[in-house]
Amino acid sequence: MSMHPALRLLATVLVALGAGPAFTQDAPRLTGADRPMSEVAAPPLPETITDDRRVGRNYPEQPPVIPHAIEGYQLSVNANRCLECHRRQYSGLVAAPMISITHFQDREGQMLADVSPRRYFCTACHVPQTNAQPLVTNEFRDMLTLTPASNEAE
């Protein structure tokens, strides 16, 4: 069944009129300045915490943050300053935490003799600890605080 041409035109006009207000509404923005092309001052960089104390993680599977300064560390295809302290054979000498065993696995889960190439560039996951305030409220609670056995111990 085909629609009469006049009805088709009327339906098209009604749809267009109804969609008009939807197109004129402002789209919600996630971030940025009120005027996207205007220049705004960059916020100050947060201060790096360099007290060498490890801190708890903020969410499950979070890579540990770096509790010391890394400015000037060489991290390239030819050199990785992080490995001078955190490689298995050196970590005991300098009291640095050893690299996780997961960093020695390739994509297929096979163990390698040295750090996997996909885990070689530490700062792809690990970042220096700073005094930056969270952008959103963190409601993460460690599993140990949620289990009945740990609640009885309190």
UniProtKB/Swiss-Prot annotation:
Keywords, in A-Z order: Electron transport, Heme, Iron, Metal-binding, Periplasm, Signal, Transport
Region (Disordered): 27-47
InterPro entries per the UniProt record, alphabetical: Multihaem_cyt_sf, NapB
Residues the entry annotates as binding heme c 1: H68, C82, C85, H86
One Pfam assignment: NapB
Gene Ontology terms for molecular function: metal ion binding
Cellular component per GO, a single term: periplasmic space
Keyword presence, Metal-binding: yes
Residues that, per the record, bind heme c 2: H103, C122, C125, H126
Signal peptide from the UniProt entry: 1-24
Keyword check for RNA-binding: no
Modification after translation (UniProt): Binds 2 heme C groups per subunit.
Loss of function: phenotype: Decrease in nitrate reductase activity in deletion mutants and failure to grow in dark under anaerobic conditions.
A biological-process GO annotation: anaerobic respiration
Cell compartments where the protein resides: Periplasm
Reported induction: Induced at high levels by nitrate under anoxic conditions in the dark. Induced by oxic conditions, even in the absence of nitrate. It is suggested that the extent of electron flux to nitrate or oxygen, under anoxic or oxic conditions, respectively, serves as the signal for induction.
Protein's job: Electron transfer subunit of the periplasmic nitrate reductase complex NapAB. Receives electrons from the membrane-anchored tetraheme c-type NapC protein and transfers these to NapA subunit, thus allowing electron flow between membrane and periplasm. Essential for periplasmic nitrate reduction with nitrate as the terminal electron acceptor.
Quaternary assembly: Component of the periplasmic nitrate reductase NapAB complex composed of NapA and NapB.
Stated family: Belongs to the NapB family.
Protein name (record): Periplasmic nitrate reductase, electron transfer subunit
Organism: Cereibacter sphaeroides
